[in-house]
């Protein structure tokens, strides 16, 4: 009798666990809306911070860049940015250290930017892997007046990606406007430059984990 009760109790606990796991996991039902950054009207891109329906988090930022062009930013990242001192010029307070991985001269896609920087007052050690814009847009929106830079953002000290990001720099009168978009909570195990299937995905992309 006691054995039967234990079996029933054990089965019940397993059922509760599986149901809890099932209800906690959601697919990415909020689209990575990179196209939003390509709005034509100057100043129309909306800065915002908000939780999406699948519990991932969206951060959108608009930065005015007087006397700067999209091509200048392209050259800065593709060729000029080589040292931690250069990196600090971009943000003297928050940017601390940098290095490159898989970087080729005059190329940015396929390279990974290894950085230490403060984010909200806390030190973040990140691996920012720049990818071809087709991964986000399904096409390449780069042209003479637009520089598009997209990336998978991961932890530097562990083979795990945690976010997606996209910067769009567009020429406007008197300079450029940079539209930045970050999708936080896209978790994936990483091997080299490839994202791989792993239990990390199952746990990291659960609704509860994204919330907390």
Give, region by region, the residue ranges found by the protein language model.
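Short beta-strand-initiation
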Residues: 5-9, 58-60, 164
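Glycine-rich loops and low-complexity Gly/Arg-rich segments
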Residues: 87-89, 114-115, 203-206
